[in-house]
Amino acid sequence: MMKKTLLSLLFAVSCIWSYGAGYQLNLQGLRQLAMGGGGTAVPWDASTIFYNPGGLSSLGSWQINASALFIMPNVEYAQLPTGSYTANSNAQTFYPFNFYAGGPLKKGSKWGLGLGVYTPFGSGLKWDDNWTGRFLVRSINLQSIFVQPTVSYKFNDHISVGAGYIYAFGSLDLTQALPLQDLTGAEGSAELKGNASGMGFNLGVHINANDKLQFGFTYRSRVDMKISSGNATFVVPTSLLSNFPNTNFSSKLPLPEVASVGVGYKVNEKLTLQLDVNFVGWSAYDSLKFDFTQHTSNLKDEHFPRFYHNTVAVRLGANYDVNKKLSLMGGLAYDPSPVSDGYVSPELPDADRYVITCGIAYRATSKLCIIAAAEFVNSIARDGTYDVMNFKGTYKTTAFTPGIGLSYNF
């Protein structure tokens, strides 16, 4: 049991990072968020640095775009097969942000430059200390930040390309109970904390076919997040300290490549529709390895098979200009899970998701635009088994994410 519990702790780390960076919540731009998370074909503002670097040189002027969001997730658990035991994750709010600055070097320039600093995901989950799955997880906290300097070149009025270098860094903190008790009856605990970093790139092509039709193609590379000196801390009875020494660990956690294609169509002077399709190369995430600086009979280097499968997400959105100052937006998305049966666990349980979004943009002045958006994520209830611990349950996950931001044109 003790060996399996430690294995589950390590496995949970991989679940955290895969959920954090690869699970396509698409919070990197508020206008795009409001339209189902798509933005490959239409460079709405400076956040095209993330969605399609090729659109940067097509912006009319230099822009600054900043936004803050508030993720409020909830997970419901029912134990299988009877469902007699249920639990809910504790209420929490997480605060990802995005900042972009960029545009053409000068009016009429073919070259565009920009910088994006964005959080592809920052969230977590906390269960009650005495819940039935405490030997798998008690709490999770994840923060991640990507920094992307970007350059774009506009060949003509129809075709532009762009490329960005990505430096990614983040932190994680995971705690769980251990099935060991001291003389007072208090259970032991384990905590894994670490900082990770990695590098990648973002490529994009923007095609302005005519006054009504636009296309976009992007490729974001795989990023290997490397933890070189994570901390593993154990609280156990004194007699067992030699079996559970506080130590360091290293690992490499791959975040998958994403290829996207998008189309935008201006139906009339007021209405624009857009469609995005995202291919996520999860199959590259086939295994995970942990190396510890100290080893005991209970603490050894481990290698985990993952068996993720590739997914294709679809995003549909609309922008309607009520007048010159006010725009309304809405969208839908379907985002399937890459996690195979036998690997569904309460760290961050994963299932196919349906997404509804909406938003409003108000042009306060000719230069300043205020944007508010919201996303509701509803996951299909999933019966899952975590084979490592033979832990079974039905999971139902929802999340509400409002956000507010500003865009300023120079």
How should each PLM-predicted stretch be described?
Residues 40-42, 49-62, 101-107:
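Outer-membrane beta-barrel pore proteins
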Residues 41, 70-72, 121, 378:
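Active-site/binding-pocket entry motifs
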Residues 23-39, 57-74:
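Transmembrane beta-strand segments of Gram-negative outer membrane beta-barrel proteins
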Residues 11-19:
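Hydrophobic h-region of N-terminal signal peptides that target proteins for export
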